[in-house]
Swiss-Prot record:
GO terms for cellular component: periplasmic space. This is Alginate lyase. Residues 1-28 form the signal peptide. Substrate binds at S67, K68, H140, T141, Y258. It comes from Pseudomonas putida (strain ATCC 47054 / DSM 6125 / CFBP 8728 / NCIMB 11950 / KT2440).
């Protein structure tokens, strides 16, 4: 019996040394991009007329919602006004939570008023205690709302969690409660969006992966991080040589708009992966760069999208500056210059509640001060 033990001791010492040297790097705590460490911009005195509204009613029911494209053909590109109104009404409390948390975190990181932080924690804590949004009775629109809300909340939470001002230090019990809930939502989101056939993987899967990535970093869950990276790679490998996503081309007149909509989650995931030593920029021959360049070109001249999708493009969304919030992480990844950089500067600052709020303050804070 002793001989194997001696052999083990002899070979294990270098192995243990290697583990000590490299194992730590492999399991280092997950971190966000550098901009999330920013402290409170300028501490203000007084309440600034801030009033904490009552938290929206936690949504604990079945996640069964009507789609705004109800009755549309397989392109899912024609809005149904009646079903969209019903969708907005039934998801109103969820959207109020998303937008409210994003706004209050932004206010707090700007002004540092304790009431702003307390109100944010009250809202999130109320929903966490209720176990909101965790129903396993859902349809496609329902599971979509779950991952959108998770991305909004975890995206905002990261700004509090990693800020050099350490706003959560005095609220650890509440923070733990909220993070446990976010983790449960992320775990359910993984179940919701795993193992889909390729023809079903589109922007929804990318947004799901962003929500899981944001939560992974907020809660230091390497398994969730790995899942988000895996989903990113699937998405990147869907981008063809011309920079098109075949499953978004199916949206016909809204193909360009949906290519643009696919970019924010993909760019954020790649940015967060890079912060943790995983470089996804070159995946599928620089697919993310190709996708972004194609959308920017299409916004100027949509004829290539019209030719590929077979329909004249609906440019409504492409005229809204905030729809290009992906430019912040994308330009941080690919170092935009010239015309692209100029376009980004013209449209700043970018604020997207689904990405956790003020994206420009995170990625290009000096630009915000110029506005």
């Amino acid at each position: 019996m002793r001989r194997p033990m001696t052999l083990f001791k002899r070979i294990s010492s270098p192995a243990l040394l290697a583990l000590a040297l490299f194992g730590g790097a492999a399991h280092a705590a997950l971190v966000p991009p550098q901009g999330y460490y920013q402290g409170i911009e300028k501490l203000k005195t007084g309440d600034g007329n801030f009033r904490c509204e009552a938290a929206p009613q936690p949504y604990t029911g079945p996640l069964q919602f009507r789609s705004k494209y109800e009755g549309s053909d397989k392109a899912r590109a024609t809005l149904n006004a009646a079903s969209e109104k019903a969708f907005r009404k039934s998801t109103e409390d969820i959207t109020t939570l998303e937008k409210g948390v994003s706004k209050m975190v932004g206010q707090y990181m700007r002004d540092g008023r304790p009431a702003q932080l307390d109100c944010t924690l009250t809202w999130l804590g109320t929903w966490a205690r209720a176990g909101a949004l965790l129903s396993t009775d859902y349809n496609h629109t329902g599971k979509s709302m779950r991952k959108w809300a998770l991305g909004s909340m975890s995206g905002s939470w990261l700004r509090l969690k990693f800020s050099n001002s350490q706003p959560l230090a005095a609220h650890q019990a509440e923070a733990d409660l909220i993070e446990k809930w976010l983790t449960r939502l992320a775990e359910q989101t993984v179940r919701d969006w795993s193992d889909l056939p390729l023809e079903k993987i589109n922007n929804h899967s990318y947004w799901a992966a962003w929500s899981v990535m944001a939560t992974a970093v907020a809660t230091d869950r390497r398994d969730l991080f790995d899942w988000a990276v895996k989903e990113y790679k699937v998405g990147a490998n869907q981008v063809d040589d011309q920079g098109f996503l075949p499953n978004e081309i199916k949206r016909q007149q809204r193909a360009l708009a949906y290519h643009n909509y696919a970019l924010p989650p993909l760019a954020m995931i790649a940015s967060f992966a890079q912060a943790n030593g995983v470089d996804l920029r070159a995946e599928n021959n620089f697919a993310l760069q190709r996708l972004g360049e194609g959308v920017l070109a299409g916004a100027r001249d949509p004829s290539h999208f019209k030719a590929r999708a077979g329909k004249k493009q609906d440019m409504t969304d492409l005229k809204v500056d905030s729809k290009y919030s992906w430019l912040e992480p994308w330009c941080a990844l690919y170092h935009c210059v010239g015309d692209t950089l100029e376009r980004k500067h013209d449209m700043q600052p970018f604020n997207s509640f689904r990405l956790g709020g003020d994206v420009t303050r995170v990625y290009d804070p000096s630009a915000e001060s110029k506005k």
